[in-house]
């Protein structure tokens, strides 16, 4: 049986792992086995947290809208219900930005809803 030299393939695979873990501390970026484990863990965490970020931002927007709505004397769920009934198409991100940066505009929207 002939000898198989697979240095290039193995080196390429290891290099990809070390590139992924280049900013990690200590053995997590120096030793292949621990770097491989930490790289897989980092990729799994980043995948999970991309969806978690969307969830967290939506919660933040709802909290901001609720606070601004209660300052105008209405609860969050009544506000959303009235927005749909009056066919005002503003998503939660835009409503939160308006509530945070332009309270006069938000008050105008509230008056439009309550008519």
From Swiss-Prot:
Coiled coil residues, start to end: none
Gene3D superfamilies, A to Z: 6.10.160.10, Ribosomal protein L20
GO function term, MF aspect, one: structural constituent of ribosome
GO biological process: ribosomal large subunit assembly; translation
Keyword line: Chloroplast, Plastid, Ribonucleoprotein, Ribosomal protein, RNA-binding, rRNA-binding
Family under the similarity heading: Belongs to the bacterial ribosomal protein bL20 family.
UniProt cross-references to PANTHER family, sorted A to Z: 39S RIBOSOMAL PROTEIN L20
HAMAP family per record: Ribosomal_bL20 (MF_00382)
Name under which the protein is recorded: Large ribosomal subunit protein bL20c
Organism: Physcomitrium patens (Spreading-leaved earth moss)
